[in-house]
């Protein structure tokens, strides 16, 4: 692999304000460097101290890190705790039961405040209801829910009894849900009749019924349904149960099930480059520690904060920075059911103003779409709202381009709020490389420096460090507590995917390209080095999309690549060969529309290709390998400069280039 060229030449620097630095948990670069030095000096002592200070343990651990079966690392292995106890009970016991845990705003603007006392009651009742249905420690429960208090309650209730939850994003199709139900071996499914998004009721229970009817998930004995809209749904009296009915008669008291620190808290599926989604397994102790610790460091969390992460609980960001991180610290947070553009594109800014949000965390995709809306209509421009309560703003899901960064800084942050541009992954459990708001000088487009204890580096294809200024492969050199433990049911795939022998078998392979600044050492993320696309912060495997396209009766062959997109960061571009003659004009447009809808049904709307181009064939080597790098160039509209001498059919490039 030749060195990755860095094209970002960003020299603007934004210093933390004295006001922010003065009250920060990590105040100034000297404090940051002291923590980094502590971790380097005594790695296990550093991580042991954080775990003792941050979490409540029923049985204290005596050993911090077990590397005897690397890369299957164990942290705090002989310790026992419960994630739900840490998230709820301990705050009630400390006299903070009447503190608001969740300010929930529904799609239609209805607001519900949930205190820690309320949350304890609701989680305990639902946990007891799960136990009544025979669900026990170690069982897997799939949660297919809208953004709701009930979704958070379901996750916390599983944690309370030691069941392992697997949340599936409510935008996924019945086929995607079925794959996950089968792979994880679920014994129960928690869902909703419908979900509300942008004023529209969208089905969930009926999609869940389709998924269950596909077979392979006969172990699912209970389907528990939250009544959100009262819409018409199918019903199976032998299997289906209303959430409100089964919890009504349950006790408010449910003792937490103490579990070992390595007990699987959850399994969350993420797209892989080989087609089948990967069930990323996370622990209880190490994961919970980092979700809470990064709240303290990255967001400089204070008890007086009103925190708002706009992610969905179906993604890891919603796990770490809605369900677990804020609650573990006893914080108050906003949870939002709807979308940023309904009833208008000022919804986020209105909510920040109304709820007096102090820390705001969203995706670059949302920012880019709201920039367009604000430029078109001054009424929904952030400067038309009072955002003065904000003190820290953040981004997650994908790198943010410098232009959007500066707009966000000036118009949402009022040129005074630090931006924490966070790099991390489903597999890392929490933030890895990010500025600290009271310490790190900010550079637009750079996630800056690793958090203390995170040994990130940029290496070449043999695992050797590359010099600053030269692009390479992003890796992490030492294990950390919140890291992925395995791929559910496939430990060999875990080793090959994340600790490849080509890099020596000991480096965690992030799968992203990166470059470090020659002077500051700051990291800039340069995108995926494999065939996983990042669309609006959602990781989508190209193989999954290709498989969905080829499953259509019209399609003989398909290849999917990404291309840059101003709104979604990356757009899906599909090159398709039909089983009949290559269509043109209106016929091509109609078939393309049908294929988009097909992919939406097979996988979910987020996977729909933005571009579909038809060809008589695909560019292939003589051995039959599709030349994806050439397709990437075509998708971007670039001139083909690569060597095409190995191509069996070079003329196809002209045809695919013209078929836009």
UniProtKB/Swiss-Prot annotation:
Instruction: Please list the disulfide bridges.
Output: none
The cross-references to Gene3D superfamilies, in alphabetical order and at most eight, read: 3.30.300.30, N-terminal domain of ligase-like
The family database entries (HAMAP family) matched by this protein are listed as: Ac_CoA_synth
The entry's family comment says: Belongs to the ATP-dependent AMP-binding enzyme family.
Which protein is depicted?
Acetyl-coenzyme A synthetase
Q: What class of enzyme is it?
A: ligase
Name one cellular component (GO) term: cytosol
PTM summary: Acetylated. Deacetylation by the SIR2-homolog deacetylase activates the enzyme.
Catalytic activity, EC? 6.2.1.1
Q: What positions does the entry give for Mg(2+) binding?
A: 550, 555
């Amino acid at each position: 692999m030749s060195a990755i060229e860095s094209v970002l030449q960003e020299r603007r620097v934004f210093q933390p304000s004295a006001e922010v630095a003065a009250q920060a948990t990590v105040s100034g670069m000297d404090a940051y460097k002291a923590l980094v030095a502590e971790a380097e000096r005594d790695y296990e002592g550093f991580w042991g101290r954080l775990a003792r200070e941050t979490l409540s343990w029923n049985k204290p651990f005596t050993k911090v890190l077990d590397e005897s079966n690397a890369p299957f690392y164990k942290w705090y292995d002989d310790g026992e705790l419960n994630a739900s106890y840490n998230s709820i009970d301990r705050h009630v016991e400390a006299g903070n039961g009447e503190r608001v845990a969740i300010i929930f705003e529904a799609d239609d603007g209805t607001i519900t405040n949930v205190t820690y006392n309320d949350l304890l009651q609701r989680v305990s009742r639902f946990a007891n209801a799960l136990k009544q249905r025979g669900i026990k420690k170690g069982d897997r429960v799939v949660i297919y829910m809208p953004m709701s208090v009930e979704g958070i309650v379901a996750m916390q209730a599983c944690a309370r009894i030691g069941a392992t939850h697997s949340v599936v994003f409510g935008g996924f199709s019945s086929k995607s849900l079925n794959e996950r139900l089968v792979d994880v071996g679920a014994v129960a499914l928690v869902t909703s009749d419908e979900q509300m998004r942008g004023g529209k009721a969208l089905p969930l229970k009926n999609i869940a019924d389709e998924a269950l009817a596909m077979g392979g998930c006969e172990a699912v004995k209970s389907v528990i349904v939250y009544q959100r809209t009262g819409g018409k749904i199918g019903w199976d009296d032998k299997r289906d149960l209303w959430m409100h009915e089964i919890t009504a008669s349950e006790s408010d008291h449910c003792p937490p099930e103490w579990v070992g620190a390595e007990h699987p808290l959850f399994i969350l599926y993420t797209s892989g480059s080989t087609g089948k989604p990967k069930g990323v397994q996370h622990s209880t102790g190490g994961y919970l520690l980092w979700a809470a610790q990064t709240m303290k460091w990255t967001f400089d969390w204070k008890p007086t904060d009103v925190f708002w992460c706009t992610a969905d609980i179906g993604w890891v960001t919603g796990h770490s920075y809605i369900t677990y991180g804020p609650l573990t610290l006893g914080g108050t947070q906003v949870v939002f059911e709807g979308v940023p553009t309904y009833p208008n594109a000022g919804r986020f800014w209105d909510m920040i103003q109304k709820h007096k949000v102090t820390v705001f965390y969203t995706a670059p995709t949302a920012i880019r779409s709201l920039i367009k809306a604000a430029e078109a209509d001054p009424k929904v421009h952030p400067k038309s709202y009072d955002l003065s309560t904000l003190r820290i703003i953040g981004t997650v899901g994908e790198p943010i381009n410098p232009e959007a960064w500066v707009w966000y800084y000036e118009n949402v942050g009022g040129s005074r709020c630090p931006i924490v541009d966070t790099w991390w992954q489903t597999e890392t459990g929490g933030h890895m490389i990010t500025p600290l708001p009271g310490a790190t000088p900010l550079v637009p487009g750079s996630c800056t420096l690793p958090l203390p204890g995170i040994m990130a580096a940029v290496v070449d294809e043999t695992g050797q460090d590359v010099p600053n200024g030269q692009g390479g492969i992003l890796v992490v050199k030492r294990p950390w507590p919140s890291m992925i433990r395995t791929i559910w049911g496939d430990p060999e795939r875990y080793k090959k995917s994340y600790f490849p022998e080509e890099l020596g078998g000991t480096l965690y392979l992030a799968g992203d390209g990166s470059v470090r600044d020659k002077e500051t050492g700051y990291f800039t993320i340069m995108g995926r080095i494999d065939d996983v696309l990042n669309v609006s912060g959602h990781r989508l495997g190209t193989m999954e999309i290709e498989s969905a396209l080829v499953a259509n009766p019209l399609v003989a062959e398909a290849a999917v690549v990404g291309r840059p997109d101003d709104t979604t960061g990356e757009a899906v571009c599909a090159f398709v060969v039909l089983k009949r003659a290559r269509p043109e004009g209106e016929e091509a447009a109609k078939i393309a529309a049908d294929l988009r809808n097909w992919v939406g049904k097979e996988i979910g709307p987020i996977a729909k290709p933005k571009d579909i181009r038809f060809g008589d064939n695909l560019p292939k080597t003589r051995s039959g390998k599709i030349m994806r790098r050439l397709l990437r160039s075509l998708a971007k509209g670039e001139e083909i400069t690569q060597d095409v001498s190995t191509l069996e059919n070079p003329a196809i490039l002209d045809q695919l280039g013209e078929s836009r």
